[in-house]
C-alpha cells in the first residue's frame, strides 16, 4: 500500500559533528589503557557529548531508560564488547530492546520498544520517553526491527573518545568512578 511508510527513529546526539574518519574497534583497542575516566564520564552524561545517560542508566536507583540498564550489563562485558556496542550497537541487540514497527488500520506508523503486551493491547516506549498504547484490534502489521535505536558512534566519536567512554563504563564494575553526574 503506497500510503504506509516504514521508518525507524534513531536518536542522534545533537552536539557531535560527523567525523571524516571512521572509528573502528581496531583503532580504539590500543587506546584503552590511556582512556580518561573523567572525559568518558563527561561524554556519557553530557547533552552536548555522547549523551548516553539520556537512554542508559548506570545505577539501579536511577529510573529505567529507553536503552538497556548498563549497571547489570557491564558485569559480564569485556572492553572489546563495550567498544563494539558503542561503534556498532546493532551488532548485538539485548533482548527486549529491538525496535518494533507497528502499522495501525488508520495507516499510522508507530515505532518503539515493546514494554507491555496484553491480550488486547501493545504498549510501546518511544525514544522521547512517551508510552503509546495501541489496541491490538487496530494493528495491521507488526515487525520487530533488526536495528538498534542507538546511533552508531563510529563517525561521531574519535577513537580516543570511545576509549574514554569505555574506560568510564569499565570503571563502574570496580567502583573506581561515580555512577552519577
Residue ranges of model-derived segments:
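Gly/Gly-Pro-rich "capping" loops immediately C-terminal to redox-active cysteine motifs
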Residues: 61-87, 98-144, 149
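Alpha-solenoid HEAT/Armadillo repeat architecture
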Residues: 45, 75, 155-158
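Active-site phosphate-binding and catalytic loops of NTP-dependent enzymes
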Residues: 92-96
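Flexible hinge/switch segments at interdomain interfaces of large molecular machines
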Residues: 17-19, 56, 141-143
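Electrostatic cytochrome c docking/interface patches
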Residues: 16-47, 66, 77-81, 105-108, ...
Amino acid at each position: 500500500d503506497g500510503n504506509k511508510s516504514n521508518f525507524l527513529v534513531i536518536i542522534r546526539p545533537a552536539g557531535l559533528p560527523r567525523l571524516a574518519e571512521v572509528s573502528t574497534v581496531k583503532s580504539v583497542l590500543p587506546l584503552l589503557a590511556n582512556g580518561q575516566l573523567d572525559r568518558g564520564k563527561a561524554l556519557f552524561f553530557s547533552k552536548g557529548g555522547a549523551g548516553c545517560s539520556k537512554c542508559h542508566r548506570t545505577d539501579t536507583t536511577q529510573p529505567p531508560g529507553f536503552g538497556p540498564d548498563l549497571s547489570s550489563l557491564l558485569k559480564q562485558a569485556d572492553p572489546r564488547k563495550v567498544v563494539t556496542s558503542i561503534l556498532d550497537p546493532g551488532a548485538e541487540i539485548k533482548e527486549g530492546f529491538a525496535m518494533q514497527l507497528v502499522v495501525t488500520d488508520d495507516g499510522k506508523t508507530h515505532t518503539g520498544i515493546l514494554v507491555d503486551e496484553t491480550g488486547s493491547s501493545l504498549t510501546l516506549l518511544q525514544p522521547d520517553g512517551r508510552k503509546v498504547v495501541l489496541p491490538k484490534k487496530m494493528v495491521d502489521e507488526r515487525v520487530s526491527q533488526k536495528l538498534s535505536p542507538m546511533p552508531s558512534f563510529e563517525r561521531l566519536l574519535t577513537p580516543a573518545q570511545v576509549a574514554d567512554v569505555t574506560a568510564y563504563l569499565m570503571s563502574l564494575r570496580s567502583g573506581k568512578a561515580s555512577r552519577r553526574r
